[in-house]
């Protein structure tokens, strides 16, 4: 069964095939089911980009979308996530997309349910589809991963994006650096080396900024965020020192003038909105992988 839970479960060849399918969709290839197929989106945390991106992807593939509201469901009555998924499975749902605040919520589910789970983010753990859309964006820009230098900057400890990207990009041959306030370092993430931000600015090919996750911190004050921007954010002055041809990425939502100066969000180097566009194509590709009997399957030459 084609769950997509973490990047570590994907081989280089599988990553390549997903990216090639996504690239085909980006280039206008169509793939629609001719039979009624239900897919459920279960979001237990707030989301704009991931939720709507999945919904657009599902509808482009001709799937029937069930949008689950936790507040209006039997979860409020104490129903377990397992029972919720089994209920959806019993009434004919063929796959579930889940975002959940619990790290690795899927560990006890993956061998108990009979439909694919697509992880749309688990707590501070993993975010595989965000990683895949980031990989697609980098691939489109540079044509390769091998030899690239990539800085992942900010709240590394609480970031599922940092965890997924560092692991996958290392597997694909890139060199990963982290820049972070001391209290937000993740010593368990062994896929990169910590260096001061100002040393990395002129060296790296990709500046991947992370959102300051104020919902996971006790203190979120304007003066603290101003200090963060000056010490750890991509200021206009830092952007001027970036190497020629390098790009800026951010998983969004963006805290303007915190992680990045507002005027840089749509600057020439920025690929932030391109990432969002690519999110639809990548999610079409992972849905296609999860539902091969409905949407068919394609094999490709290695794309990495």
Swiss-Prot record:
Reactions catalysed: carbamoyl phosphate + L-aspartate = N-carbamoyl-L-aspartate + phosphate + H(+)
GO biological process: 'de novo' pyrimidine nucleobase biosynthetic process; 'de novo' UMP biosynthetic process; amino acid metabolic process
Annotated residues for binding of L-aspartate: 77, 160, 211
Binding annotation for carbamoyl phosphate: 49-50, 99, 127, 130, 252-253
Key word Ligase present: no
An annotated Gene Ontology molecular function: amino acid binding
One Pfam short name: OTCace_N
Descriptive protein name: Aspartate carbamoyltransferase catalytic subunit
Gene: pyrB
């Amino acid at each position: 069964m084609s769950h997509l839970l973490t990047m570590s479960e994907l081989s280089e060849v599988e990553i390549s095939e997903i990216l090639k399918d996504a690239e085909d969709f980006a280039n206008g290839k169509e793939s629609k089911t001719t039979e009624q197929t239900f897919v459920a989106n279960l979001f237990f945390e707030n989301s704009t980009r991931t939720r709507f991106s999945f919904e657009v992807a599902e509808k482009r593939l001709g799937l029937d979308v069930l949008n689950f509201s936790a507040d209006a469901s039997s979860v409020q009555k104490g129903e377990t996530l397992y029972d919720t998924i089994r209920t959806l499975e019993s009434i004919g749902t063929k796959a579930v997309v889940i975002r959940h605040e619990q790290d690795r919520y899927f560990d006890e589910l993956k061998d108990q349910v009979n439909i694919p789970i697509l992880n749309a983010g688990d707590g501070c753990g993993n975010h595989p589809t965000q990683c895949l859309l980031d990989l697609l964006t980098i691939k489109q820009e540079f044509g390769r991963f091998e030899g690239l230098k990539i800085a992942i900057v900010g709240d590394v400890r609480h970031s599922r994006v940092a965890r997924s990207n560092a692991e996958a990009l290392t597997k694909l041959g890139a060199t990963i650096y982290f820049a972070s306030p001391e209290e937000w370092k993740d010593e368990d993430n062994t896929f990169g080396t910590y260096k001061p931000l100002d040393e990395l600015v002129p060296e790296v090919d990709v500046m991947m900024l992370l959102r300051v996750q104020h919902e996971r911190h006790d203190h979120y004050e304007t003066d603290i965020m101003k200090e963060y921007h000056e010490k750890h954010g991509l200021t206009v002055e830092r952007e001027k020192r970036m190497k020629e041809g390098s790009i800026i990425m951010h998983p969004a939502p963006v805290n303007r003038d915190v992680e990045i100066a507002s005027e840089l969000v749509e600057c020439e180097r920025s690929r932030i909105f391109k990432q969002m566009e690519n999110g639809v194509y990548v999610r079409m590709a992972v849905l296609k992988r999860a539902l091969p009997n409905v949407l068919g399957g394609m094999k490709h030459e290695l794309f990495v």
